[in-house]
């Protein structure tokens, strides 16, 4: 794609285009990171020091960057074409979509698909080999359901969803529109509900459901459990990484981001815009407010107010954790001084 054509596409995107300086209207064939980019490739830049480190060895043909006079001066000194936007990362994401077309799957049902007569399938859907669709399940329009996926009975799947290979969607699950469920993820499995009695465990039946609102994306090997009654909810726009466990009856708000190996125990309530970094654990029935940020390996055992940034185990305000961490490193030295004082 000619660089000028790419600029026109970026202008119509969401990155807030400012200007473009094209030294050669070269054919852009693909994209690469700045340190390995070669001719006919495009990259993006958000930090001055990265450019300075790589400017001498990169052969990149064009760079998407922000409006920084120092960066633009360095690029112009090397005759590197540049596209200036307010958000280079968003522009680069759009460029990747333009340059790398996704493989199209023509609508159709593979001969090996098992689909119960009581189920309903919308228009323009693709069902790959060995897909199973259970009783009374309703699937909307323009869905792609890839090989080996099992969708059990009474499921409602909206429009424009992508279900990748070998997923399992249990009965009574509701998934709205424009969602992506990646491979080997299980939606709606039984919650971990057992009642102790006389040294034994009595199983609590899990008869609730899972509701996933529109524009949710869930990574590979995730589990979203259903509760005994009511529902587990993942609200609109939330993004979930790989290997995440969401317990029964959990409520997750809009536009949250959950990184790998997050675990949320049953009944927890997560507000809107929450960011949980890798391996964060949330205790059962805890309430996490809106726009909370929890750093990696954080253990949230009590309610967190709106807008807090928390770290550590148990979770505390980030500033307090930084101070505590600094003191912790000095404990051997402090202990030595205490022993010396005791001797006196």
UniProtKB/Swiss-Prot annotation:
The keyword Cell membrane does not apply. Belongs to the transferase hexapeptide repeat family. LpxD subfamily. Catalyzes the N-acylation of UDP-3-O-acylglucosamine using 3-hydroxyacyl-ACP as the acyl donor. Is involved in the biosynthesis of lipid A, a phosphorylated glycolipid that anchors the lipopolysaccharide to the outer membrane of the cell. It comes from Prochlorococcus marinus (strain MIT 9515). Keywords: Acyltransferase, Lipid A biosynthesis, Lipid biosynthesis, Lipid metabolism, Repeat, Transferase. PANTHER family: UDP-3-O-ACYLGLUCOSAMINE N-ACYLTRANSFERASE, UDP-3-O-ACYLGLUCOSAMINE N-ACYLTRANSFERASE 1, MITOCHONDRIAL-RELATED. This is UDP-3-O-acylglucosamine N-acyltransferase. The active site is at 248 (proton acceptor). It is an enzyme of class 2 (transferase). One of its GO terms (biological process) is lipid A biosynthetic process. It comes from the Bacteria. The gene is lpxD. GO terms for cellular component: carboxysome; membrane. It catalyses: a UDP-3-O-[(3R)-3-hydroxyacyl]-alpha-D-glucosamine + a (3R)-hydroxyacyl-[ACP] = a UDP-2-N,3-O-bis[(3R)-3-hydroxyacyl]-alpha-D-glucosamine + holo-[ACP] + H(+). PROSITE patterns: HEXAPEP_TRANSFERASES. InterPro entries: Hexapep, Hexapep_transf_CS, LpxD, Trimer_LpxA-like_sf, UDP_GlcNAc_AcTrfase_non-rep. Pathway: Bacterial outer membrane biogenesis; LPS lipid A biosynthesis. SUPFAM superfamilies: Trimeric LpxA-like enzymes (SSF51161). One of its GO terms (molecular function) is N-acyltransferase activity. Homotrimer. Its EC number is 2.3.1.191. Pfam families: Hexapep, LpxD.
């Amino acid at each position: 794609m000619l660089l000028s054509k790419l600029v026109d596409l970026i202008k119509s995107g969401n990155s807030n285009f400012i200007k473009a300086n094209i030294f050669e209207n070269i054919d852009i064939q693909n994209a690469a990171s700045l340190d390995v980019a070669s001719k006919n490739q495009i990259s993006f830049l958000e930090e001055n020091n990265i450019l300075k480190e790589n400017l001498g060895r990169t052969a990149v043909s064009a760079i998407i960057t922000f409006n920084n006079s120092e960066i633009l001066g360095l690029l112009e000194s090397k005759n590197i074409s540049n596209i200036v936007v307010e958000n280079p990362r968003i522009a680069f994401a759009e460029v990747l979509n333009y340059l790398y077309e996704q493989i199209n799957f023509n609508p159709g049902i593979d001969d090996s698909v098992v689909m119960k007569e009581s189920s309903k399938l919308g228009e323009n859907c693709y069902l790959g080999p060995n897909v199973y669709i259970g009783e009374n399940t309703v699937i909307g329009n323009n869905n792609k359901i890839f090989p080996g996926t099992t969708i059990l009975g009474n499921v409602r799947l909206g429009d424009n969803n992508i279900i990748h290979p070998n997923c399992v969607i249990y009965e009574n699950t509701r998934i709205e529109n424009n969602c992506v469920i990646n491979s080997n993820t299980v939606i709606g499995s039984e919650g971990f509900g057992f009642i102790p009695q006389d040294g034994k465990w009595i199983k609590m039946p899990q008869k609730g459901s899972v509701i996933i609102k529109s524009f949710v994306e869930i990574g590979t090997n995730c589990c979203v459990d259903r509760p005994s009654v009511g529902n587990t909810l993942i609200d609109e726009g939330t993004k979930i990484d790989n290997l995440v466990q969401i317990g029964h009856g959990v409520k997750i708000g809009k536009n949250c981001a959950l990184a790998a190996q997050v675990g949320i125990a049953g009944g927890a309530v997560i507000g809107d815009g929450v960011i949980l970094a890798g391996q964060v654990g949330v205790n059962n029935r805890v309430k996490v407010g809106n726009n909370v940020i929890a750093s990696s390996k954080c253990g949230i055992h009590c309610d967190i107010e709106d807008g807090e940034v928390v770290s550590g185990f148990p979770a505390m305000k980030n500033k307090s954790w930084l101070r505590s961490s600094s003191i912790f490193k000095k404990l051997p030295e402090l202990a030595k001084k205490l022993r010396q004082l005791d001797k006196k």
